[in-house]
Amino acid sequence: MKPLEVSEIEYVDVIVVGGGIAGVAIAEFLSRHSNLSIKLLEKAPQLGTLASGKLEGWYHTGALYSGQDDAQTFINCVNGVEDLINLYTPYFTEQCNINLTEKESNFFTPAIIPNPKGWFNDGPVYLIHPQADAPEISSSRLKSDAIQINIQRNRVLGRLEVAYGKQHNWLVNNKCLAPTYAQVENYEGLDSSLKDSTETIRNLCRQFDSSYDMEKSNYNFIKTLDCSMHTSRILRDLVTSCLSHGVTFETGIKIDKLLMDRYGPIRLKSLLCKTKEGRSKRLKAKLFIFAVGEGFEPFLNDLQVRAKLKRSRSAMVLTYPALVDTNFVRMSTKNRFHFNHFVQQREMGNEKYIYSLLADSGYANDDSNDGVDIEPILESAERYFGQEKLYSRQLYSYECVKTEFISQEEQKRRYSYWIESNSDSNYLCVLPGKFSFFPTVAYQAYQRIKTLLHFEELTPKSSFQSNMNIEIEANKLVAESYPMQIFLSN
C-alpha cells in the first residue's frame, strides 16, 4: 500500500520565523504581553545555532562605537541599556543583572550586579585608546594620523562621560532614562570620570609596545559598562519564558514556498513547509513575523523588502585556558591594530571551562572564495601575550557568518535591526542586527505588531517564574554556544 500523500494544516495567531535571538526575543515579549497563540519556526535542529551562538558574547553598551563620526550607533547601544533595564530587569529579576545603582547621592547610572547565574559577567571591558606616541601613529609619516587619533579620543571620552559618567542621571520619575542624542553630541568636556585600568592591562600594553622595540607609550584607559554575556543562557531563559506562556517551537522545518495573495494589498496566505521528518505542512496565521538572517534572500522579492542583505564573515580564535582574566579592546584608527580579548566561563556537568575569545575588526564578504585571514589576530595576540603563552594553549579558529542589512539609500554597514511592514499587509520583516539590541528589537517589533493585529494587551506577572520541566525542555531546544560545542567534540 502506498503511503498517503497528505499535508498537515496548522493555524495559529502569530508565526515567527527564525530561531536566533531576534525571533526568540520577539516571541517572548509578545507572549508575555498577550494571550495570542504563537509558534516559532527554525530550520536548524536547535535554536541559536548560527550567528547568535557563534559570537564572542560582547554586550555592547556603546564603547566600541563611541569614536565614530556619526553617534547614531552609539546612541542605539545606550538606548538598548535603557530598554533592558526597563523591560527585562524587573521581570527577569534573578537573571537580568544590569540595573541602576546610586553612584552618588540621588545620582544613578547603570551597572552590572554580580550574579554567577546572571546574563552578564561582572568583568568590564577596558577600552585601550592609543595616543600620538603609540606604535600605529608614531610609525606613520602622515601628520593627519596624529590629528585623527586625537579627534577620535575626544569623541570617545566625551560620549562615554555623558552616557555613563557624572553628566546624566539615569533615574527619572522612577524609570530608567538614557541621555538623548543632543546631550551626547553637545557635550564638549574632555575630562573623564571613567578613566581606570588594571596592572594586567598596563602590562599587556607595555608588552605590545615592546614588541615594536618602543618604550612604553601613553594610553587612555577607560573602564566601560561593556562586558561579556552568556548568550546561550539568555536564549534559554527567553525560551523558558516563551514555553511558560504557551509558545510552541518547531525546529528542523524548511520553508519551501510563500503562498502570496497578490490581489489588492499583498498578503501572505500560507507557508508551505517540509518538517524534519520530511512531511508536508501548511502553516496559516493572522500575522507572520520573519526574523531571519541567513537563508532569507530568496524571499525578499516576494515580501517586497526594500533593504538589501549582505553576508560577511569574521574570524574568532578560541584559546583554552584563558590567556588573562580581563576583557579589553584596543580601539585604533588603524584597522590592523584593532584587537579584542574576551574571557568567558561555562560549566558543563562538573567541568568548568574558562577560555578566551580573540577577534579584530577584520571581515570578508561571504561571496569571497578565500577564508577570513586569522593571521592578523594571531600576530596581535603574540604581541600582547607572547608566543610561548599563546601557543602553549589549546587553540581553535572558526568563522562567524553575519547577515546584515544595507539600506539602499545609504551603502554602509548597519548594526541596528531594520523592521519593515505594510499597514495593509499581514507580515512583518525584522532584518538582522546585534545580539545586544534584543530588548530594543523585541519592544519595537511589539509596537509595530500592535498596528497590524488587534489583541488585548496584558500586564505581565511581576516577575518570571519557571519550573524544572520547562527548563529541561528549553535546554533541549537551545544549542550550546559554539565554543562549548568545540570543547565537547575535541
Annotate each language-model stretch with its function.
Residues 219, 385-486:
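C-terminal catalytic lobe of FAD-dependent flavoproteins
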Residues 56-204:
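Dinucleotide-binding Rossmann-like beta1-alpha1 core, especially the glycine-rich loop
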Residues 31-53:
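Glycine-rich FAD pyrophosphate-binding loop
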Residues 1-11:
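A short, basic/flexible loop-to-alpha-helix module at the beginning of a structural domain
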Residues 12-39:
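N-terminal Rossmann-like FAD-binding beta1-loop-alpha1 element of flavoenzymes
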Residues 215-287, 438-448:
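Helical element adjacent to the flavin cofactor pocket in flavoenzyme catalytic cores
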Residues 25-29, 43, 59, 94-96, ...:
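Active-site substrate-recognition segment that forms the wall
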Residues 72-78, 135, 220-240, 368-373, ...:
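Short beta-strand to alpha-helix junction loop
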